[in-house]
């Protein structure tokens, strides 16, 4: 509290105390920043007011999107969180559409979207003003559009029609990389999907001279199109995302040119993670993530002796554990068993998902710095889709009942309800927090604080 003597006899001092009703009685996540909001939401404000930028370790687009909420609603929690929340909500119909393309069944697409909505990490990550929600949204769009492209008849559809999903995929790739560099991991997966599809199509045409000639005509046109939409346009999007940096640099007497500035930023970003040697209580290794052993503790406040408020970002064991096992079984089925029971479409969907999982997950095995469970956030949606695809195979072959998927959904919903206080910051009895920490198999949520 400010001593009253500060305000005595001075107009400036009195101005410090003339709006006491605007000061919150107790600081909390409802009236202030928590976790990485102190970097990303702050930087959004700095972008808006052409100030020196505090957070530069990720590309700017995600923070520009956060800034839009601040422009509309002010520099307050709702302002900096509304756009990430909207992207989190918009993610669900995108995910539903992708699942429907892969499974060709509306009930399984609904199951996929419902499970994603009930994942506690999806819930926490889409309620906070950080850039992770944006990169996942754009990755889902990338895979959706590439799936649309792969499922079209390359030799029969007009090139203009083929180019629509391919161009949308390239733009989504550019938006993703301009939000976070992990979009490059997903981009590598897109390249594998694309070239595998082209090679398979070329092999199918090799014995027909006319078909082979048409294949190469289409392929050269497609390669030229991809150079524009997967190289030139993403590079332009990335460059334009640095406009807030350019605006601030223009206010300096000896500002750096725009291209030189972008190159300097990339060098600094590239050297930042390898040079980072810090450790963290919540850090976890990549092989621990699917099994939710160690949450990322966003927020905690003790509300007297008997109540606490906490936000822990962790996956739901009812989803992550089951999905991890299902994805492994799918990989075994798709890569090693090679039976004739599965349709060509089912196998194609399996390969798309396995490539997406590998592209988004395996690069983390090479990262030397400390990592966290939320780095699995961009991989998990494809893991749950893989598990559902394996369940579809089991169900349609008569090996399991169609009721299994609804039982799984019910268990996931029950787990979400149990975990809701720990994922949302809702005040809860300390005894209940101890139940979550020590009885329910959720991993470490509060790290002994309860």
Which residue ranges define each predicted feature?
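Transmembrane helical bundles and short interhelical boundary loops of multi-pass, membrane-embedded
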Residues: 1-20, 26-29, 161, 165-168, ...
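Extracytoplasmic catalytic/substrate-binding loops of multi-pass membrane glycan-assembly enzymes
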Residues: 2-41, 53-65, 75-78, 256-257
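Loop-to-helix entry region of an early transmembrane alpha helix in multi-pass inner-membrane enzymes
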Residues: 56-66, 73-93, 110-113, 125, ...
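Transmembrane-helix motifs of polytopic, lipid-linked glycan transferases
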Residues: 82-103, 141-145
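Short acidic/glycine- and proline-prone juxtamembrane loop motifs at membrane-interface regions
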Residues: 84, 121-134, 179-182
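Transmembrane-helix signature of polytopic, membrane-embedded enzymes
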Residues: 95-118, 136-137, 154-164
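Membrane-interface transmembrane helices that cradle and orient dolichyl/undecaprenyl
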Residues: 100, 142-165, 195-205
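Short helix- or helix-capping micro-motifs
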Residues: 112-117, 124, 144, 173, ...
